[in-house]
Each structure stands twice: as structure tokens, then as C-alpha cells.
Amino acid sequence: KVVITISHAGYIKRTPLTEYKTQNRGGVGQKASKTRDEDFLEDLFVGTNHQYMLFFTQKGKCFWMRVYEIPEGSKNSKGRAIQNLINIEQDDKVKAFICTQDLKDEDYVNNYFVIMATKMGQVKKTSLEQYSRPRSNGINAITIKDEDELLEAKLTNGNSQIMLAVESGKAIRFEESKTRPMGRNASGVRGIKLKDKNDQVVGMVSVNDMDANILVVSE
């Protein structure tokens, strides 16, 4: 297995899981990556070299990469800029990541979904099967309206509970099953009504365990 780390500034690397020694609970931890002063680790995944990483950009495009294609780096390296690994436009930025199983497995891709949320409260659900045929230049994942941008993308089983939180302090929860699957070029439907034009969605989570707790942290 490997550990994939992604920093806020968009640096990515994979490191063998064996480089991380088991510690007792309450320890000080180990260094996972070297970052610049203004950068910090933002995402971490554990997977295998044969899994796929899906990258979703703020303009609504999706790019693929096999995990083994992600540059390998030690715990003390910062990794490579994602912008240099995929054919992303210069004024675009990767906003969300999904680590999936084999995209050639028809049973798998037909039973999982990608649900996306935008800054202005749109949500869209699409079958994972529609992302199973990689193209070097990426594909359109969602049509983004003017002044909006993609914020989050999550992999779901079709029966999750979806929660959206907005900057003004409100949140909404709804059943994913009530959101019908759409094609990749659709712009989605309203997930939450914003307070005013200055309000925006700040996060989305998908929950399968109805006994789970949600931790909300303000700045």
C-alpha cells in the first residue's frame, strides 16, 4: 500500500506505507511531507498503486491518473505540482480529489456515483461509469455557471446523506437518493439556497453511518 499526500498549494506525492512506523496513541507523530512556509498538507489517502485518482477542477473538469503514475517521494520531500502532471489550463485549479478502485470493473462503476457541490450551492450526481474512460485532456464533469466554481466532489454508493455548510453558518442535510443522476454536461440542481450574493458554500460531506457525528470548526 501507499500513502498519497496533497498539499494546499497543490503538491502531490506517493510514499510506501511502510515508511510510516506504527506508534502508540498519544505520540508526537512523524513528518509526512516537506512544505513551504505558506503551504500545509490538506488531503491524505491510503491506497494501492493500481487504483485511480480523479482530479476535479474549479472550472468543472475531471482528470485521471493511476496511483503508480504519481511521483514517488520520501516523507521529507514536498512532491510535484499537480499542475505539471495533468493537462490543466493555466487559470484553472484542482479543488477536489477522489481515489477509486478499478474503473474497468463494470459492476463497480455502475454502482457508485460522484456527487459534486459548487460554491453557489448547486449539487450534481453522476454515475462513476461516466468517468471510466480516461482522456489525456480531461473531460467535462459539470457545467459551471458564471461566477460559480466547483468546490467539492465525493464518491458515494447512492444511498448516502449529503450535508452542505455555508459561510453564514447554516447547513442542510438531504438524502442522496432524492438527487437523480445526471449527465456530465449538466449543471446540477440547487442544493441549498444562499442567504445573499455574499454567502457561499464552504464544505460538503457524505455520510453513510447514521450514528456518526459531524464536527464543525469555525475560523
Located regions from the model:
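Short, structured "edge-of-domain" segments at secondary-structure transitions
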Residues: 1-219
